[in-house]
Amino acid sequence: MEISTFLSIFISAALLGITGYSIYTAFGPPSKNLRDPFEEHED
């Protein structure tokens, strides 16, 4: 396998992993620990 093919597959997999983890953090069980600054703000 050529180095460019390996590099493109590695970068694609890394980006998909980061995207999947960020979606899991935003909408999954860890999202209960996130704070909402708009709810904390009082006018």
UniProtKB/Swiss-Prot annotation:
Task: Please give the name of this protein.
Answer: Protein PsbN
Record gene name: psbN
Query: Where does this protein reside within or beyond the cell?
Result: Plastid, Cyanelle thylakoid membrane
Q: Which InterPro entries does the annotation name?
A: PSII_PsbN
Residues spanning the membrane: 5-27
Please give the function described in this protein's UniProt entry. Answer: May play a role in photosystem I and II biogenesis.
HAMAP family assigned to the protein according to its UniProt record, in alphabetical order: PSII_PsbN (MF_00293)
- Gene Ontology BP term (one): photosynthesis
Origin superkingdom = Eukaryota
Query: Where does the record locate the signal sequence feature?
Result: none
Assign the protein's first listed, main location to one coarse class.
plastid
Give the GO cellular component terms, alphabetically: cyanelle thylakoid membrane
